[in-house]
Amino acid sequence: IVYHIETVHLNPLQLILVGTTLEVACFIFEIPTGIVADVYSRKLSIVIGVVLTGVGFILEGSISSFVFVLVAQIVWGLGSTFISGSVEAWIAEEEKDKDLDKIYIKGAQAGQIGSVIGIVLSTVIANLSVRLPIIVSGVLFIILALFLWLYMPENNFKSSAPEDLNTFKKM
């Protein structure tokens, strides 16, 4: 928000439109991106999502324009939907013989610790430039995607048949 107000100079209506754009993108892309995870690969879906999220962050931090912020929100929303549900499904498939509740709790705890560390580091980096933490986080997302592509195992994935995924007929 500080970046949007101080650097991009968005007004209250534009701020609302930025948030709405992200939410609409997530809503629209949720089902089509879920098909990638169910038919092709959870790992592929996660990696695509992490890359797109990183690209969205880099785009948003690099170009201080309302239009580019909106485009970045769409890219970020698309990335978010590739990740949504895929991580949990991947864990459930890869660790099916273990206590999933404990795994999910440990993951949530690690996420909270990472958030606190990220906030502190972002605050320090923002003293140089408000846009820098956004760009750095985007680059880190892309590095994470490369790491996941190289080292994330996917041994128990079973593809769903495309005809089993017709969500609109089931509704």
Show which residues each predicted segment covers.
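Juxtamembrane intracellular "pre-TM" segments in multi-pass secondary transporters
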Residues: 151-171
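Transmembrane helix interruption/hinge and helix-loop junction motifs
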Residues: 61-67, 127-132
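Short amphipathic helix-loop junctions that connect adjacent transmembrane helices
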Residues: 1-14
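Symmetry-related core transmembrane helices of the 12-TM Major Facilitator Superfamily/SLC fold
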Residues: 132-150
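Helix-breaking motifs and short loop linkers at transmembrane-helix boundaries and internal kinks
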Residues: 9, 41, 62-68
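Short, hydrophobic transmembrane alpha-helix segments
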Residues: 5-7, 35, 63
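Substrate-agnostic recognition of the 12-TM MFS/MFS-like secondary transporter fold
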Residues: 1-2, 18-37, 41-56, 68-126, ...
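Primarily residues marking transmembrane-helix entry/exit sites
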Residues: 12, 66, 70, 167-171
